[in-house]
């Protein structure tokens, strides 16, 4: 059965009961040429964990873009960062919908089967998963809807195409149910205005306006899904739910005899994310005569202690306007900043805020150091020239846990910090940048400490960022008709609060925002109040960062030296040499990296030794000069160049064979041993060496043949 839903600038086609019929819920969703399969599977036996056993996996199939996976093993293996981050977005959007006490292991799988380059896979992926979950026998009050908002030509645009997003100043992703927002992710998108770069920060009022715009689209989408699929939803399964552990006798006993102990534990927990102090109280209660006589269960006592702790913390904040560590609601923990503490690192910053500490280190590299990855919606590999990586070892919270490869949380926090800092990094920066945040202590807000430390680490490495960027984690607590907004939350407040959101930006506005809402609806006025309080906190931190910035001593001696100059693009072949021999010899001889831009003739040389860089430049200029002298002094040289292309005419068509694929295009073998260049901008599909293409001569200039694809 096919169902069409026309909403939020998309015509969405859903096919129900066609595929994956043994899953608890499934749907095939199509938007233009994008096709996504979403399935939900549920076990029939509960588990004992005290958390929701939900797993979300978003997987992109390479055949969706007509490709065969690269590498030695020709199949999809470990998910890429984009897949992992998208899985996390779907998880954060759907997790709040599950009923309280639900403890059945549940898996949501999203397969991208066909990818249209213009369609937003994250929006389609979430909405397909939402409909599949709503159709299942798991009780859901309404389907989630996810939307993306752009800001193009001074207007908000709902669900822009990928091409439109390239011209947007805003990338806002919001998910919710009806009029309740559940998850928000935002970043500003920098662009060039002539020779000047705009960071495109968003003011607090403009941000509220954008979220309001998104919320109306979510209401329309969620309502449309409910109206379309409510009659198709499976009957709710007869599930058992873990009851809320309530025992009035135990609760009264704890309140009468252990209030001071719990309060002392809260004071201690304000300094750490670990709950060891509460465990001690539980053990103490279990050893009491009352507990032994009444045969109290340890897990029940532990649960009630946790609730009592939560009650005390929230009561202090709401009624006494006082936090567990004695701070005012808008007070930031003490901050200390040290820069360039690592003598052989290009740039470093040790940023400490209370019991959260991040050592952030920046390294500068050449073009070959960029992270290259494939995307289903791009015909050419994506080169990531600014990387931000976040590490969270167990010792930062006092745990003896094994060091593993980064998980979803680490990737998510690193991505947030990267989004916050990217607008400040010059788009024309000549070097590849890798910034790493090592969390050495954690008691809340480690991702925002990474942003602050990262901004100063970039400056310490000599990167001329446009502005300093600071971040602060905020919290929100609701009790009846009262609310409290907290600045710079610690782990305790994050755990027992109703909402946490992280805001990063400059004095002029917000560059990145992430919000997870546990309580459902939040008014725009409270949201505006929270963002303005975050702005005050951000400006306070920026004051301290500016002082630290003035004290930075850049270690020029260890920074890589770079020379950028131009040559005649036609001389690139002489610099490279036959089979790359000449350029390889220069790289080995002078221990430098050399990057050539064949279209513009730009040459970029980078190395640790200034003299070596200058000598490499001198050698390249000599190669170019000798080539020029040879052309001037040799009639044969000129005649030979004309002869090579004399048999070709502009507009002439050939069946050419792909001979070599480069980052700037593909060399196509034509006839008589002559090659032509098909520039990357003309390539519409993934190419492989040996492919046959119908091409046309577009231009013949200085003995070089430029090609285009035949229609």
Curated annotation (Swiss-Prot):
Cell compartments where the protein resides: Cytoplasm
Entry-linked Gene3D superfamilies: GHMP Kinase, N-terminal domain, K Homology domain, type 1, Nucleic acid-binding proteins
Reaction(s) the record says it catalyses: RNA(n+1) + phosphate = RNA(n) + a ribonucleoside 5'-diphosphate
MF annotations from Gene Ontology: 3'-5'-RNA exonuclease activity; magnesium ion binding; polyribonucleotide nucleotidyltransferase activity; RNA binding
UniProt EC number: 2.7.7.8
Gene Ontology biological process terms, A to Z: mRNA catabolic process; RNA processing
Cofactor section: Mg(2+)
Assigned protein family: Belongs to the polyribonucleotide nucleotidyltransferase family.
HAMAP family per the UniProt record, alphabetical: PNPase (MF_01595)
Name of the molecule in the record: Polyribonucleotide nucleotidyltransferase
Annotated source species: Campylobacter hominis (strain ATCC BAA-381 / DSM 21671 / CCUG 45161 / LMG 19568 / NCTC 13146 / CH001A)
Gene: pnp
